[in-house]
UniProtKB/Swiss-Prot annotation:
Protein name per UniProt: Biosynthetic arginine decarboxylase
Chain positions found as N6-(pyridoxal phosphate)lysine: 101
Primary enzyme class: lyase
Catalytic activity: L-arginine + H(+) = agmatine + CO2
Gene name tied to this protein: speA
Organism of origin: Klebsiella pneumoniae (strain 342)
Length: 632
């Protein structure tokens, strides 16, 4: 692939920015993965890897997970805060506390724990706390307990403290403190407490309601004062050691982060004035990732990098401490998305393509009705004059005629052949107009976008949007999507991607397209009979755990991929994926009962025994097969 072609492809899909040096296009026009950019020789051709796995029986769709990316993300964030602390003379420590709600899979938690980097864990429920406590012996670090808490949750956290772990119970509701003090006395343990302050500062974007005065969690200023007095009266003021706030997930604008940290730093100062020895400053989540690669303030991008993020936090806290003569606290961030998003790619196969093809135009019958004649006259005029200023007018005239023909068809004025002729001529018109439009002409941009959407290939992909990318459906989250191969060809086609659920919402509506977002996906020319595999990137945060079972499509298979400098690759199956039986059991449909009921029906058909046996074997094989489409 020439450098010019490679450059164009990188710009089209913006992979140079959202790929973050983990993903690239190689000289064959294939996606390559480098799990550790500090070791550039350790990389793998993803297209070839998937083909090799398929030859060994790998089913698609499947998640290809790269634990080494997780570890590199953790090292990168820790390094950014180390540089910031050194740059500003900050004396406090820093810990990244991983909120396991982002991805609770064992492979994620243990890959991070075994990275050799300092790491804490955060839980937001009883189940998560049990997972965290069980792994706490591997980290000997910090545990932060957030979320709503009942007596059992609080007892579990205090048991962890009694066992020698640093467990911070963050008070988010005033009702929690009485239970904490009661259970601490019962267990004879000094609780280690935090308080979540509800800030006036609020970020922007899809998760802005996580912060601000109307946020679901946290204590208002009055309640913070009440908490201090309750603890003082109980003789437990020294237990309050951590200050926590949260502006929201995926903060796009660094100014919002800086504003929130400055406000929360005032809480740190004021609490010290009240005699509260706050030792840890937990700024929560918010560190975003650039799904678009546009480096902007849009909801799916960020206008800052790791160094700027760390610098703003360390400077704001350090400045408040210096101004008021206070010690530098340990800084904690709960940066789950930034750690996990990049490490997982969903790979799937295309199962069908529907194209709007150009065909040779033929005139209507001489006695054809006026709308048909009008469409043909417009077609001839466009070919005879070639006047670009009339392109929009010609397209609009054809649209009006086609609209009249559709109405006439419903009333019986036009027959099926006439409707088909009109629709095909309109497609031809769109093809011709599209060829003559100039993307550099701003006046042409709206009509180019309209035609790209109208003429795009419909590509049916073997996956469930609701299971594998629920945020794309639920909140219009954008995820980068690319073919894994054929990227040494110019992206001449446009496409929309549709899943295999029986739901019209099962479609991807937005795609990365250069420095912007489009409603269609750029695609290189491809053979519809042998289409490329597709990769859905940056799905490592939230998607696996939020995925739902629409149409009873289950978890996909998942593999962990390890890449080494000598070019060797190790692949481990980490999740076999759900069978049909698994999904049926989840909705209380027992597979054995279903098989018995089906067997009884087959017996009553009167078919010969061999055919009955064939039907039973096919039903049973389906029960214990993959929930997604499989080739014979």
């Amino acid at each position: 692939m020439s450098s010019q072609e490679a450059s164009k492809m990188l710009r089209t899909y913006n992979i140079a920015w959202w790929g973050n040096n983990y993903y690239d296009v190689n000289e064959l026009g294939h996606i390559s993965v480098c799990p550790d950019p500090d070791v550039p020789e350790a990389r793998v051709d993803l297209a070839e890897l998937v083909k090799a796995r398929e030859a060994q029986g790998q089913r698609l769709p499947a998640l290809f997970c790269f634990p080494q990316i997780l570890q590199h993300r953790l090292r990168s964030i820790n390094a950014a805060f180390k540089r910031a602390r050194e740059s500003y003379g900050y004396n406090g420590d820093y810990f990244l506390v991983y909120p396991i709600k982002v991805n609770q899979h064992r492979r994620v938690i243990e890959s991070l724990i075994h990275s050799g980097e300092p790491l804490g864990l955060e839980a937001g429920s009883k189940a998560e706390l049990m997972a965290v406590l069980a792994h706490a012996g591997m980290t000997r670090s910090v545990i932060v307990c957030n979320g709503y808490k009942d007596r059992e949750y609080i007892r579990l956290a205090l048991v962890g403290e009694k066992m020698g772990h640093k467990v911070y119970l963050v008070i988010e509701k005033m009702s929690e403190i009485a239970i904490v003090l009661e259970e601490a006395e019962r267990l004879n343990v000094v609780p280690r407490l935090g308080v979540r302050a509800r800030l006036a500062s609020q970020g922007s974007g899809k998760w802005q309601s996580s912060g601000g005065e109307k946020s679901k969690f946290g204590l208002a200023a009055t309640q913070v004062l009440q908490l201090v007095e309750i603890l003082r009266a109980a003789g437990h003021l020294e237990s309050l050691q951590l200050l926590h706030f949260h502006l929201g997930s995926q903060m796009a604008n660094i100014r919002d982060i800086a504003t929130g940290v400055r406000e929360s730093a005032r809480f740190y100062v004021e609490l010290h004035k009240l005699g509260v020895n706050i030792q840890c400053f937990d700024v929560g989540g918010g560190l975003g990732v650039d799904y678009e690669g546009t480096r902007s303030q849009s909801d799916c991008s960020v206008n800052y990098g790791l160094n700027e993020y760390a610098n703003n936090i360390i400077w704001a806290i350090g400045d408040a401490c210096e101004e008021n003569g206070l010690p530098h606290p340990t800084v904690i961030t709960e940066s789950g998305r930034a750690v996990t998003a990049h490490h997982t790619v969903l790979v799937s196969n295309i199962i069908g393509v529907e194209r709007n093809e150009y065909t040779e135009a033929t005139p209507p019958a001489e006695d054809a009705a006026r709308p048909l004649q009008s469409m043909w006259e417009t077609w001839l005029e466009m070919h005879e004059t070639g006047n670009r200023r009339s392109l929009r007018e010609w397209l609009h005239d054809s649209q009006m005629d086609l609209h009249d023909i559709h109405i006439g068809y419903s009333s019986g004025t036009f027959n099926l052949q006439e409707r088909a002729w009109a629709e095909q001529l309109y497609l031809n018109m769109c093809h011709e107009v599209q060829k003559q439009l100039d993307p550099s002409n701003r006046a042409h941009r709206p009509i180019i976008d309209e035609l790209q959407e109208r003429m795009a290939d419909k590509i049916y992909v073997n996956f469930s949007l609701f299971q594998s990318m629920p945020d794309a459906w639920g909140i219009d989250q954008l995820f980068p999507v690319m073919p894994l191969e054929g990227l040494n060809k110019s992206p001449e086609r446009r496409a929309v991607l549709l899943d295999i659920t029986c739901d019209s919402d099962g479609a991807i509506d937005h795609y990365v397209d250069g420095d912007g977002i489009a409603t269609t996906m750029p695609m290189p020319e491809y053979d519809p009979e042998n289409p490329p595999m597709l990769g859905f990137f940056m799905v490592g945060a939230y998607q696996e755990i939020l995925g739902n079972m629409h149409n009873l499509f289950g978890d996909t298979e998942a593999v962990d991929v390890f890449v080494f400098p000598d070019g060797s690759v190790e692949v481990e199956l980490s999740d076999e994926g759900d069978t049909v039986a698994d999904m049926l059991q989840y909705v209380q449909l027992d597979p054995n009962t279903l098989l018995t009921q089906f067997r009884d029906q087959v017996k009553n058909t009167g078919l010969d025994d061999a055919l009955q046996q064939q039907f039973l074997e096919e039903f049973e094989a389906g029960l214990y097969g993959y929930t997604y489409l499989e080739d014979e």
